[in-house]
Amino acid sequence: SQMIITNEIILGEDQNHLRDLRNELMGTGTYIQKAVEYLTEKGYTFQDTYTSTFVDNPTTWDIFAASTNTDAGIIGPTFDYLFAYDAEGVMQPRMAESYEISEDGTVYTIKIRPGQIWVDSQGRKIADVTADDWVAAAQHQADLQDCYDLNNFIAGMTEYLTGETTDFSTVGVKAVDDLTLQYTLKEPASYFISLLQKHAFLPLCRSYFLSQGGAFGQAEFAEAQAQPTYLYGTDQNHIAISGQFLCTNMTEKNSITYVLNENYWNAANATLKGVKYVFSDSSDVSRTYDDFINGVTMTLGLNTQRLELAKQKGDFDKYAYVGDVGRITFLFWFNLHRQTYANMADGAAPSQKTDAEKSVSCAALQNAHFRRAIGHAISRGAYLAQNVGEDLAMMSVRNTLTPGTYVKLDEDVTIDINGTATTFPAGTWYGAIVQAQLDADNVGVKVWDEK
């Protein structure tokens, strides 16, 4: 809802000015207004519908079963978070109004915004939003065996996942009353509130889920999911919606259309009133490029092919700019103790290696020097250049697995850095703390830049 959408392509120099303006006004609450004023002065006009592309049909409309960025991106507009960062990086209340933290830092009591409702894809009321919807969501994720974030933080979740208990009331997600939600953590995490804009902390309408053939309990859910009567998340017409948009049309490999949910809690103040995705698998480079230039779509990432096309047509110097690096990292893993050499489910696709070759590979991978040699031998810049070209290759290189903007402190925190008590104020990003420790260790590695 805080998107600024122009009818014209914004020039690269104006994009750079907007980025500098945002950095200057961070935390003041005035960036959106000032950005609109600047763009208006530059002759830009505005619209309220955002158009982008999708590369594949969603495999599910159950946000908690979504395992790809494509699925999550398509389902995302139909949900809203308890809290979320605004355009200036300030955490703002959304479906929640406020929160309190216990003295020991392990219990977060969250007040849910009253008057919110669940609707179907046509905007018809299904039920009131209550705190129990977050309890239902947590259990559904556990039943799906897909709750990494919850298991890391929430007390009792591990015991439920492993089957040590089947009683979900022992897990630290509780509805104190209809509008009071409570999370109990395994241990204090001063950045916990900043995690609440992750999908793991979205709600699920319990009554609607059950009406679509769902069930709670790991064994019960597995049985229900296998039945033809299980319909939840099979398409956009079989989910309950609490977010800003209704998906009114989904045409496979063609288009997806969203309109404003008039029952959304902040609909009256929404400046973004529509979203449309058009299909593009990027196989036709010229078409994808021309769609952007002609205003059919509003964003275009440059890979090596598009970069060359932009330079040929004289658009690169005019429109290109380097956007903010995202919050997702991609990495290589070593399988140090490989035990399986075929598909676990059915034994298909067995490895062709001999037992001797398997033994040699295992020994090599357990050698730290071998692993380091591979790590140093791989040029991340050269790898990225294959997709984005030499000029932009190093822009996306990170030296930490977890992005520096992953979480930020909700309160002042003092920690020990090599024997010195060091206080970081509320609002400090994770990356700044890591950099402070690295600097104290004289490591000489850059992982965080305040800019």
Regions found by a protein language model. Name each.
Residues 111, 133, 143-221:
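Surface-exposed binding/hinge segments that line
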Residues 50, 54-75, 95, 122-127, ...:
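A structural "hinge/loop" feature
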Residues 32-35, 50-104, 240:
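N-terminal lobe/hinge region of extracytoplasmic solute-binding protein
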Residues 1-10, 87, 113-146, 244-387, ...:
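Extracytoplasmic/periplasmic ligand-capture domains
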Residues 1-51, 85-92, 435, 442-448:
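N-terminal hydrophobic or amphipathic helices and topogenic motifs
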Residues 87, 188-189, 197-276:
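Gly/Pro-rich hinge or "lid" segments in bacterial periplasmic/extracellular proteins
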Residues 41-51, 241, 268-273, 368:
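Immediate post-signal peptide segment of exported/extracytoplasmic ligand-binding proteins
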Residues 54-58, 187-189, 301-307, 387-390:
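Beta->alpha turn/N-cap motifs
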